[in-house]
A protein has these predicted regions:
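N-terminal capping segments
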Residues: 49-146, 267-293
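Sec-dependent bacterial lipoprotein signal peptides
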Residues: 1-20
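Sec-dependent signal peptide cleavage junction
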Residues: 19-35
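Low-complexity, Gly/Ser/Thr/Pro-rich intrinsically disordered linker/tail segments
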Residues: 224-293
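Internal, charge-rich low-complexity segments
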Residues: 82-101, 204-231
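...with weaker cross-activation on analogous glycine-rich loops/strands in unrelated enzymes
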Residues: 147-226
Length: 293
């Protein structure tokens, strides 16, 4: 952790750097919140492959888009953003929570100990209390691919996650400049952040899931002029209905449209990652109906 402090001191010399160890400018949403930056370029890309027992035999049937989305939903409404959450003490890979099946009870208790005034700047490296963006996705992937605790994890630099996962043969990688559409389940990596696409609305806004201050939440991209979009409306509607306490504390659902132009993409290969219910063809409305109704 001494290296973290040194990194912070150096970063003060830049105009907008946060304690990310490599001086990157933060990605902000329309509220001024900062997406996860703890998983910076300095983080080790601990890109492990699924264990043998999850690559062969009956267990393969459990590795599916349905399971991935089910896991992605579980921390919603009760998991706060913590810089370094999901990482280990050495800050070079997955921590205990990110290689454990099911949500950590500590995430919910920490949420209950806090209120609308929660500020993630005050809880940096309380790694057991919540999740940052790559810790969140690493936990989701672990719970999708693995069937017991304590195996090698999937937490790594958020910036590299889409490309690294595609490199495992899990899907197709597309550079940010070439991305033209956003389907359910797409893993999207931008500088200092990673998020999960949940499909494209009629107005071309994109619904998404990510861990970004104040926590794990549904969001939508704004319109070009910064106005509210259909995706933002859906994120608010379903959060308010299903997580009213969260909505009462943190009623923020919009992210800048540049999420779309700045993010590379990994689209799951449905030949090896089952999509029996055709989630990739669903609209955000259809998906949310499946997830919550």
């Amino acid at each position: 952790m001494k290296k973290k402090v040194i990194g912070y001191i150096l970063s003060v010399a830049t105009s907008i750097c946060l304690l990310n160890g490599c001086g990157k400018a933060p990605d902000t949403d329309n509220t001024g919140n900062l997406p996860s930056q703890s998983d910076s370029q300095k983080h080790s890309e601990a890109s492990q492959r699924p264990s043998e027992e999850t690559q062969s035999g009956d267990d393969v049937d459990a590795i599916s888009m349905e399971k991935f989305l089910h896991n992605a939903k579980m921390p919603l409404g009760s998991t706060l953003y913590v810089w370094g959450g999901g990482w280990n003490e050495a800050d070079d890979g997955a921590g205990t929570e990110a290689v454990t099946l099911g949500p950590s009870p500590r995430w919910k208790s920490f949420y209950e100990e806090n209120d609308a005034s929660y500020d993630y700047h005050d809880t940096k490296y309380q790694i057991h209390d919540g999740l940052d963006c790559s810790g969140y996705l690493g936990w989701v992937v672990y719970n999708t691919f693995e069937n017991e605790n304590g195996k090698a994890g999937y937490v790594m630099s958020s910036t590299q996650m889409a490309e690294a996962f595609a490199g495992k043969g899990w899907g197709t990688y597309t550079a940010a400049s070439e991305v033209t559409d956003w389907k359910v389940g797409d893993v999207m990596s931008m500088k200092g952040h990673v998020w999960i696409a949940l499909g494209t609305c009629d107005d071309q806004s994109v619904l998404l899931l990510h861990a970004s201050p104040p926590g794990v939440r549904l969001c939508g991209t704004l319109m070009e002029d910064g106005s509210e979009s259909k995706a933002v409306e859906l994120a608010r509607k379903y959060t308010k209905a299903n997580y009213p306490d969260w909505h009462g504390r943190y009623p923020s659902y919009g992210v800048d449209r540049n999420y779309l132009s700045r993010s590379s993409q990994m689209r799951w290969n449905t030949e090896t990652f089952s999509d029996a219910l055709s989630f990739q063809s669903m609209t955000p409305e259809e998906l949310l109906g499946w997830m919550f109704d």
